[in-house]
């Protein structure tokens, strides 16, 4: 049996949507690092997270949490069982979160765990805007 190798989390991206394309490619729509709202509580209709795991082999449990600014309240949590057969290949774990409610402006956190150990924390700034802006 092959030796178990703990994978590295090479990136975490936040976006509006993810699509699987022909040939195994993925398309990311609306990559962002901030959420803007004119009032609170605010509901973000669709938040997709993309995690890429690489250089690992074996089976692992991953957990993704969206946390409040004080990191005490879990807004969302997803768990996935990773099965990595060969350290040369990458695995992309995609989670879609619908209607995420942000109760107040502030710095929220996306945390990723591998077998119960915190691997990374990604900041998500939720900002109050006075009027709707267009880019």
Predicted features by range, described:
Residues 2-135:
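Contiguous segments within soluble domain cores/interaction surfaces
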């Amino acid at each position: 049996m092959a030796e178990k190798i703990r994978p590295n989390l090479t990136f975490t991206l936040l976006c509006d949507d993810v699509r699987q394309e022909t040939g195994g490619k993925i398309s990311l729509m609306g990559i962002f690092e901030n959420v803007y709202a004119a009032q609170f509580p605010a509901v973000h209709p669709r938040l997709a997270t993309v995690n890429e795991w690489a250089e690992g082999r074996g089976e692992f449990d991953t957990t993704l949490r969206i946390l409040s600014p004080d990191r005490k309240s879990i807004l969302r949590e997803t768990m996935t069982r990773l099965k990595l057969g060969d350290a040369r290949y990458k695995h992309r774990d995609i989670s879609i979160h619908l209607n995420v409610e942000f109760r107040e402006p502030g710095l929220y956190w996306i945390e990723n765990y591998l077998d119960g150990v915190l691997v990374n924390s990604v900041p998500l700034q939720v900002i109050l805007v006075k009027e709707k802006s267009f880019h």
